[in-house]
């Protein structure tokens, strides 16, 4: 098991979340760990499933998560990262390249982008809202607004709809 990198973000969640929401949060943390510590996907998934999801860690009780949802997000982001990053880059403003974002924000955007692309069964508004909530757990400034704007732009490109908007129908 890898130790947690120093400076690793810890969320400030005040409300209880559903198992998929917890899986999303854990996936963002795992993607952060992979980015910062260079941990591999198999190793980080095994670590989270064995020692974190639903477990007590350093006196903090991790909430129970949907392990299949967690695995799908982490593995999906890793598998599709070369496709996701250019899409995210296009959704960012010109003065904010993806490389300028911190690791946590990149993890949130990659996970949200993957879910928009791969999980058509989940409503756009749910995905955007969940990842905005995750951003709010880590940030108090403008980052949640950035997550909302970027995922909304991506939803328009990927699904032909934005948060709260109905899908466009072709005649």
Swiss-Prot record:
Keyword annotations from UniProtKB, A to Z: RNA-binding, Transcription, Transcription antitermination, Transcription regulation
Keyword Mitochondrion tagged: no
UniProt keyword Transcription, yes or no: yes
Pfam families: NusB (PF01029)
InterPro entries: NusB-like_sf (IPR035926), NusB_fam (IPR011605), NusB_RsmB_TIM44 (IPR006027)
Gene Ontology molecular function terms on file: RNA binding
One BP annotation, GO: transcription antitermination
Residues making up the signal peptide according to the UniProt record: none
Highest taxon above the source species: Bacteria
Assigned GO CC terms: cytosol
Family the entry assigns: Belongs to the NusB family.
Function: Involved in transcription antitermination. Required for transcription of ribosomal RNA (rRNA) genes. Binds specifically to the boxA antiterminator sequence of the ribosomal RNA (rrn) operons.
Protein name (Swiss-Prot/TrEMBL): Transcription antitermination protein NusB
Taxonomic lineage from the root: Bacteria, Pseudomonadati, Pseudomonadota, Alphaproteobacteria, Hyphomicrobiales
Gene that specifies this protein: nusB
């Amino acid at each position: 098991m890898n130790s947690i990198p120093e400076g690793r973000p810890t969320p400030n969640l005040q409300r209880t979340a559903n198992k998929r929401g917890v899986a999303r949060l854990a996936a963002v943390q795992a993607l952060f760990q992979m980015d910062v510590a260079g941990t591999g996907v198999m190793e980080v998934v095994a670590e989270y499933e064995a020692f974190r999801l639903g477990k007590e860690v350093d006196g903090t009780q991790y909430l129970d998560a949907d392990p299949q949802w967690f695995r799908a997000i982490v593995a999906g982001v890793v598998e599709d990262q070369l496709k996701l990053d250019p899409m995210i880059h296009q959704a960012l403003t010109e003065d904010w390249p993806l490389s300028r974002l911190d690791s946590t924000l990149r993890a949130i955007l990659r996970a949200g982008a993957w879910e928009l692309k791969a999980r058509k069964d989940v409503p756009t508004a749910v995905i955007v809202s969940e990842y905005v909530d995750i951003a709010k757990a880590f940030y108090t400034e403008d980052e949640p607004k950035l997550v909302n704007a970027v995922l909304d732009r991506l939803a328009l490109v990927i699904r032909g709809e934005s948060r709260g908007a109905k899908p466009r129908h072709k005649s």
